[in-house]
Amino acid sequence: MTDYLLLFVGTVLVNNFVLVKFLGLCPFMGVSKKLETAIGMGFATTFVMTIASISSWLMDTFILVPLDLLYLRTLSFILVIAVVVQFTEMVVRKTSPTLYRLLGIFLPLITTNCAVLGVALLNINQSHTFMQSAVYGFGAAVGFSLVMVLFAAIRERLAVANIPAPFKGSSIGLITAGLMSLAFMGFSGLVKL
């Protein structure tokens, strides 16, 4: 049980997908202008990453490896992710039309989010078991959501701050992301993976 807890904490804080592995930067920068949009995208991405991580592990273990179709791994993972995203989009549209409108084009773009594909591929490359894949996928998603929500809160405060003209917009956003990355480096001694 402690192994799963260490894997979770290590994935969320120490090896964060956005700030350490630099995966998922497009939605990180694009959806983080408003806090409520970032929270909604975080929930949707958490669901998709966790389910896609489990589904891709199952596909690899029970279909691709036994049939020696490893060359189709990336393509099949993208297909699994696309199916999970479509399912998520249907659920969000039915349960929260406001959130569906707020997320707009970013919800279907979860399919091309490199963090979602990255967690599926890293699970296989690190030879995780089923439970480790589920914990790793959930931890990566929680870390992604945590960083996106924190970044959105900071960007909302920066929108009303007195920032010099050359630094407004994406410039201050990238500087802020860099400072957040430095702050998360403080967790590097927390868990040895």
Curated annotation (Swiss-Prot):
The chain crosses the membrane at residues 5-25, 39-59, 62-82, 102-122, 134-154, 171-191. It is found in: Cell inner membrane. GO terms for biological process: electron transport chain. It comes from the Bacteria. Its EC number is 7.-.-.-. Disulfide bonds: none annotated. Keywords: Cell inner membrane, Cell membrane, Electron transport, Membrane, Translocase, Transmembrane, Transmembrane helix, Transport. It is an enzyme of class 7 (translocase). Its main location: membrane. InterPro entries: Ion_transpt_RnfA/RsxA, NqrDE/RnfAE, NqrDE/RnfAE_oxidrdctase. Pfam families: Rnf-Nqr. The keyword Cell inner membrane applies. The keyword NAD does not apply. One of its GO terms (cellular component) is plasma membrane. Part of a membrane-bound complex that couples electron transfer with translocation of ions across the membrane. The complex is composed of six subunits: RnfA, RnfB, RnfC, RnfD, RnfE and RnfG. Belongs to the NqrDE/RnfAE family. This is Ion-translocating oxidoreductase complex subunit A. The gene is rnfA.
